[in-house]
Amino acid sequence: EASQAQRDWIKNYFKIPYSLRPILTERMPNLFLNDEEINVIGDYMEKVFIADSLELQIKTDQTKITKGKILFYEKYGCQGCHQINLKGGYVGPALDKVGSRLRPGWIFHWLKNPQAFNPESIEPDNQLVDDEAEALTAFLMSLK
């Protein structure tokens, strides 16, 4: 969904699709689209699928990033399911370059209530307060 992914990432993904979750062997097939076709798809996704309610600016100063990193590794143990630099679990998507892939507003709202986006998601709803969700978002956005 376009509310989730950044435009440049969408374009690159359509050029060279890959599996987002290490545990899954399924992936989007390569459709061998040219740049013009990819731009048309990107334009369509941005016009139709972006939810304005998910647009949000998150401060990504070093203090927030550090707090988010502590929350990720120490308080919530996110590395149990997610990999960063090939370290961590295999259940959730690898987060190495998540800051280049996802939009900050989407990350924030996903962290606050994952089941609102996908009722079958196994991502835990940790009942994050806004400050924690902002810090985790800042940390994740720093991963590029």
Regions from the PLM with identified roles:
Residues 19, 58-59, 85-86:
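Short helix-capping and inter-helix turn/linker motifs at the boundaries of alpha-helical repeat units
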Residues 56-57, 81, 113:
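Intrinsically disordered, low-complexity segments enriched in polar/charged residues with Gly/Pro
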Residues 60-84:
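Sequence/structural segment immediately N-terminal to covalent heme-attachment motifs in c-type
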